[in-house]
Swiss-Prot record:
Keyword Ribosomal protein among UniProt keywords: yes
Family affiliation: Belongs to the eukaryotic ribosomal protein eL21 family.
Family annotation (Pfam families): Ribosomal_L21e (PF01157)
Gene Ontology terms: cellular component: ribonucleoprotein complex; ribosome
Organism of origin: Picrophilus torridus (strain ATCC 700027 / DSM 9790 / JCM 10055 / NBRC 100828 / KAW 2/3)
Protein name: Large ribosomal subunit protein eL21
GO biological processes: translation
Entry keywords, A to Z: Ribonucleoprotein, Ribosomal protein
Gene, per the UniProt record: rpl21e
One term of GO molecular function: structural constituent of ribosome
Region (Disordered): 1-23
Keyword Ribonucleoprotein set for record: yes
């Protein structure tokens, strides 16, 4: 019997799948979204774009934009008492009011 894969996308079948209507590449507007420091954003992974994709454990988490790193944004949030920072491309982020 073979060993189970332990890659960065393992165990993410439900998170990474899209519905039939949403399949394919995202629109250009979605790729070029802009955020300001202090904006609230949620991580919504778009599996069609592997660049700047955060780990699937962070799917659905909401945090505050604290800065930029290249063309990606740094999103900070707390898990328990631990402050976490995730670097994600704007395609994988959605503004929250």
């Amino acid at each position: 019997m073979t060993k189970m894969s332990k890659g960065p996308r393992s165990g993410s079948r439900r998170v990474m799948t899209k519905s039939v209507k949403n399949k394919g590449m995202p629109k250009v507007n979605e790729m070029m979204k802009t955020f300001e420091v202090g904006d609230r954003a949620a991580i919504v992974i778009n599996s069609a774009v592997p660049d700047g994709m955060p780990h699937h454990d962070f799917q659905g988490i909401t945090g505050v934009i604290t800065g930029m790193q290249g063309s990606c944004y740094i999103l900070s949030f707390k898990v328990g008492n631990v402050e976490k920072k995730v670097i994600a491309a704007p395609v994988h982020l959605r503004k929250v009011q």
